[in-house]
């Protein structure tokens, strides 16, 4: 797949339901998520705004910048959220056939973002590891439908 086309799969307005796992960062439960994403810089970057609501109240907000690098299958994710964790470096990513997969690393551990696509739906799974990637814990799973 052409790299810009992979990023373009996320472009649009999306809404869906999420299942948040109980983790060391907080209680689990259902949530409603939505994101708006658009291509920029000639299709080499995707700008995303994400909002999560729990019990009808704003929970997590994030801004993300996805980029397609100069090399084949070279992607990066810059993630900024309302929890205050700014990235020291971008998360490297790759396209594995039907999914965009990114691995964020910080002193707190590692988090995988796995975006899977089908028709007009997108699934996002977040998983965290606190032992260098030996064991992974679910953080969130969301299924989103394109609304525009």
Q: What does each model-found stretch correspond to?
A:
Residues 1-148:
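Hydrophobic small-molecule pocket/channel-lining residues, especially in calycin-type beta-barrels
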């Amino acid at each position: 797949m052409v790299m810009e086309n992979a990023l373009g799969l996320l472009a649009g307005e999306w809404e869906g339901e999420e299942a948040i796992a109980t983790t060391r960062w907080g209680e689990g439960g259902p949530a409603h998520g939505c994101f708006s994403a658009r291509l920029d810089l000639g299709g080499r970057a995707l700008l995303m705004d994400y909002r999560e609501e729990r019990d009808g109240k704003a929970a997590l907000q994030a801004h993300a910048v996805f980029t397609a690098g100069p090399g084949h299958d070279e992607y990066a994710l810059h993630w900024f959220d309302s929890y205050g964790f700014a990235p020291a470096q971008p998360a490297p990513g790759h396209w594995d056939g039907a999914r965009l997969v990114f691995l964020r690393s910080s002193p707190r551990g590692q988090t995988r973002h796995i975006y899977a696509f089908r028709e007009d739906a997108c699934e996002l799974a977040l998983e965290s590891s606190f032992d260098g990637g030996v064991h992974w814990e679910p953080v969130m799973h969301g299924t989103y439908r394109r609304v525009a």
